[in-house]
């Protein structure tokens, strides 16, 4: 509950990063539509720490879909990627924008 309180304060129902509703009173309750647990952003199997900066409250189904996938995964029909930001990892929704080649011109005239 400490991570819930740190993340959401006094809120009793919120949406996780994948858009699923979780309820404070449904911690680890697989029989609840709003059941949630704590997930490692960078999986422990990949060296992720059990520290607040690497933990996120999420719906049990979201956690099941993410599992130990790294760096990309799908949850609730949405694509996500785990990226390193300074000294920690974050979950970001993937965008459909094509990546630009380094030093490639913005436009090409013919």
Predicted regions: what is each one?
Residues 1-28:
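Short, charged surface segments at domain edges that flank catalytic/cofactor-binding sites
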Residues 47-53, 64-110:
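Polybasic, low-complexity binding patches
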């Amino acid at each position: 509950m400490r991570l819930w309180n740190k993340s959401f304060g006094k809120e009793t129902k919120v949406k996780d990063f994948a858009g699923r509703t979780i309820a404070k009173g449904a911690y680890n309750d697989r029989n609840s539509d709003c059941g949630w647990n704590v997930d490692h952003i960078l999986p422990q199997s990949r060296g992720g720490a059990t520290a607040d900066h690497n933990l996120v409250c999420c719906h049990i189904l979201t956690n099941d879909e993410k599992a130990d996938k790294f760096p990309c995964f799908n949850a609730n029909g949405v694509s996500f990627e785990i990226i390193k930001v300074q000294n920690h990892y974050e979950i970001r929704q993937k965008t459909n924008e094509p990546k630009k080649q380094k030093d490639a011109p913005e436009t090409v005239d013919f």
